[in-house]
Amino acid sequence: MGLRIGELCGLTWADIDIENRVLYVHRTVQRICTCNSDGKKTKIIISVPKSDTSFREIAIPEFLAEYFMAFKGDDNYYVLSGSEKIVEPRAYQYRYKRVLSESNSGDHTYHGLRHTFATNCIQNGFDVKTLSMILGHKTVNITLNRYVHPDYVHERKLMNKLAMLF
């Protein structure tokens, strides 16, 4: 669904309205530096999303609503942990990398999934404005210039469509 890792970590079951198939993004989890006299330290905070457009409602596809229904926990539980305990972004990134390594799937970041999601959405007919809203971007330019990556196979299909015109 193209969520940022901090948004995913901050997601509680109360943020998922299964009946109306809507996911609400209104918090993020992040690790911040608390540099003090003891040295460089960090702490986990729960805060508001990155920008005003990051507060959003995302329609949930039916197959995902069914999945959520099967695993739904208490409203105050975090989706990733299944409890009131947060899974912090760095820990989730480490888990993701470990799964990729164990499955010989290469070395990718969680954020790369956001790019893949955006590219797949465009290749499957999403309009850029809707995708930009789903991703929580301020402008469609951010979506197009940073998140949507050309694909040779998709380009070939489009070029072959031109042949039908002649």
Where are these regions (language model features)?
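Extended hydrophobic-aromatic, low-complexity segments
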Residues: 9, 25, 33-37, 69, ...
